[in-house]
Amino acid sequence: RFSKNWHPHQIAIVDDMQVLLAKIKGEFVWHQHEDEDELFHVIKGTLEMHFKDKVEIVSEGEIIVVPKGVAHCPITKDGEEVHVLLFEKLSTAHTGNVKHENTVSNYPKI
């Protein structure tokens, strides 16, 4: 239904939480969410979540939670397109404290 990378689509709302579906490829932007945790569930491919002091590899079927206030940068390797579900509060800004060319203000709904 959509082809643009780093452009999540909202697929559900549960109370004050939203579920987003995104295709990602390459490197995103370093950012953090001051007041919200963010959960990534990899449904296709392998995601590298870069933190200031480490890199976590998240394989298909696995999840990672990025705690609020923690700088992070999701990356995919070797041109791989990765599909993820994101679980976060409705108040969560896409690129947190950073404005970037990939920043999305309003998520399209599927």
Feature map (PLM): residue ranges:
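A short, N-terminal "cap"/entry segment at the start of jelly-roll beta-barrel domains
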Residues: R1-L20, V29, K99-I110
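Structural motif
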Residues: V19, D37, E81-V82
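Short acidic-glycine-tyrosine-enriched beta hairpin
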Residues: K52-G69
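Short, conserved beta-strand element in jelly-roll/cupin
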Residues: K23-I24, H33-F51, F87-K89
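Short loop/turn positions at the edges of beta-strands in beta-sheet-rich folds
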Residues: I13-D15, E34-E36, I43, K68, ...
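Short histidine-centered beta-strand/loop micro-motifs
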Residues: Q10-A12, A22, V29-E34, F51, ...
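Double-stranded beta-helix
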Residues: A12, C73-I110
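A generic "binding-loop/recognition-motif" signal
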Residues: H7, M17, G26, K54, ...
